[in-house]
Amino acid sequence: MKTQFIELTGKTLLDVVNEGEIDFKQLHDAGVVGDSILRINPHGEIELRCKSNWMLVGGLIGSFEERLTELTGLDWAE
C-alpha cells in the first residue's frame, strides 16, 4: 500500500497546528513560507515540495488528523 498524504500550503499548516505540535523554527529554517506546497502523511511527517523532489522538514504530534481534513476539505490520497 502506498503512503497517503494531504497537501496544503504553509499558511494552511499554521491554521491546522496547535502550539507545541510542531517546531516552527525547524520549518522556517527549512524554507517553509506561507505559499510553500507541503504534504503530510497520516504519521504526521511533513514534506516540502522542492523543484524536483519532496524534502522531509518536520513532523506533527498530537491529534491533528481531524483538523487537517476539516480545514483543507481533503481526504487522504496516494
Regions found by a protein language model. Give the residues of each.
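Mixed-charge, Lys/Arg-enriched low-complexity segments
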Residues: K2-L13, N53-E78
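Acidic, low-complexity, intrinsically disordered interaction modules
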Residues: N18-T69
